[in-house]
């Protein structure tokens, strides 16, 4: 679409070929090399369409660009997941422990894929968005079952509220109180989890 049919927002993207996107990303190659950075693929969840990224990932690998993916690991095609390992240097696993995001088979699928990646010795870190409905004891138990010793935590925010308002849609507030957030962080630390707090 050239523009939003509801007149709510303007176009913020345009299609690029793999070649065009590669050229665009390689403009910062010297910065990547100096900083130890690279290219990160994230949100929604790029693992859902990872095969479509293979041509781009292959070109970035040829250029020795460090590639990171942020994903829930909710992928039922383990063959595709295994194929992607050769292109991805770092995996950020976005843990979906919010009750509002519950899927009956999420734990099984994610745990299976996590085991696959660990067996291959890939670099994995874990991230969690904290919302008010989360119970610290329950989260700690789930982290223990997954063998998560270190966790990046982001406090839920309400940045999307204005977008919902423009669309005339109800906005559900998940932003936790400062007390519940600090209590959660304390519970993680007391359980021996190495916590890194993320800020926007």
Model-identified regions with their sequence ranges:
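Electropositive phosphate-/nucleotide-binding environments in soluble metabolic enzymes
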Residues: 15, 137, 178
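A short acidic, glycine-rich active-site loop
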Residues: 99-105, 171-182
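Conserved AdoMet/S-adenosylmethionine-binding subsite of the radical SAM
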Residues: 22, 26-166
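A C-terminal junction/extension of Radical SAM enzymes
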Residues: 179-200
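Iron-sulfur cluster-binding cysteine motifs and their immediate structural context
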Residues: 1-14
């Amino acid at each position: 679409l050239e523009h939003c049919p509801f007149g709510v927002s303007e176009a913020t993207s345009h299609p690029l070929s793999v070649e065009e996107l590669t050229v665009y990303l390689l403009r910062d190659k010297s910065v990547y090399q100096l900083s130890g950075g690279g290219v990160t693929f994230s949100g929604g969840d790029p693992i859902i369409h990872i095969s479509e990224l293979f041509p781009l990932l292959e070109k970035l690998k040829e250029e020795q660009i460090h590639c990171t993916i942020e994903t829930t690991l909710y992928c039922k095609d383990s063959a595709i997941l295994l194929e992607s390992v050769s292109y991805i240097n770092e995996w950020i696993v976005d843990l979906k422990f919010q009750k509002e995001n519950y899927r009956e088979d999420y734990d099984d699928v994610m745990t299976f894929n996590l085991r696959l990646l660990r067996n291959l010795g890939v670099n994995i870190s874990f991230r969690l968005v904290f919302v008010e409905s989360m119970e610290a004891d329950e989260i700690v138990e789930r982290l223990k079952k997954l063998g998560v010793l270190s966790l990046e935590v982001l406090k839920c925010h309400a940045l999307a509220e204005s977008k919902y308002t423009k669309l005339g849609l109800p906005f559900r507030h998940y932003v936790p109180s400062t007390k519940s957030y600090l209590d959660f962080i304390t519970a993680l630390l007391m359980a021996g989890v190495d916590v890194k707090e993320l800020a926007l």
